Amino acid sequence: MLKIFLLTLLMISYTTIADEGMWEPYQMEGLKKELRATGYKKNISNVSDLFKHPMNAIVSLGGCSAAFVSDQGLIATNYHCIERSYLQFNSNAENNLFETGFVARSKEEEKKSAPGSRVYVTLESNEITEQVLMGVKDETADIERAKIIEENIKQIINKCETTDEIECRVRSFYSGETYKLEKVLKIKDVRLVYAPPAYIGEYGGEIDNWMYPRHTGDFALLRAYVSKDGSSEEFNKDNVPYSSDSFLKISSRGVDDGDFVMIVGYPGRTNRLLTFNEIKYDLEFQFHEVVKFLKRGIDLINEHSIDEDGSKLKYRGLKSGYENYYKKISGQINGAKNFKLLESEKENWNNFLRFVDKEASSEDKQYLEELLKLIGKEQLESRSRSY
């Protein structure tokens, strides 16, 4: 299951030191020393409690992070996050918002989003590992284990989703070691307020994408609406702006050298705990297959998209997504090669194996051996299902 949790990327700009990685809010209390050393001076609870300001101002668009920036439902997010559901949906040959950009000078001018566009506000997050694994025993076969877990999750979600505006998700962390139940409010009426033209929002294109430094106006503004009684409803002219529990204030001062910077959001996943075998598999096989698949998709769109029938505009968002991921994976392959990543990871892995051989119990050694066998089996099956 996709591992999704709150990202906190801690960076300090006055030196070359950067403490980075994905951290859940509850882990912040254990990082007090590191936070203080990097310049964080406020109360740790400000970044450890998901349901207090400023953390509860952060929301998800179901694939992108965003934040409330006013008490009138105004949301700041990235330009690339609104290309398909907002710009492409509201564009045509005569009114191409990619070329002109868009600004609503009043709430009445704001544009509705494509069907299915949502803002997700987290209401609760609780660990439910015991409930998910209820009925699973050490001797339970893998297929039976999966069936039990699937049925338990269905029952948990059915019990949690009491109304249409509530969505509940069970998230798996650390490959099934921990499970959490997220209860979110689905805001169904989301409108476009502002987006720059593409020459600002996509400045540098795929040449600058994933590169540093980058100078792109990759931002946009949306607004969330609910019915007058506060319930979440689809687009309706009588809906009113959603009033969030808190919102972020945008500083006009900017940042100076030495300022503490923290990024908070809802990312996809982290793969920092992969074994050497998994890293090697990705870099020597899986990533190359993904690149070939994406390149084929980009070529097909270019081949069959022509201005006359408006297909270029219709497929612009999809093509942009393909190109973005293509650049990312290609860059990871080249970066790993340039920095001799496999060589260094092999050395780290050998050091780990020597430690295991010397310090681990026979039971732990057996667990590691079984894990590596399962990884090898999974990789063989993955090759057979390759793109």
Predicted feature locations:
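Terminal presequence/propeptide segments associated with secretion/organelle targeting
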Residues: 15-387
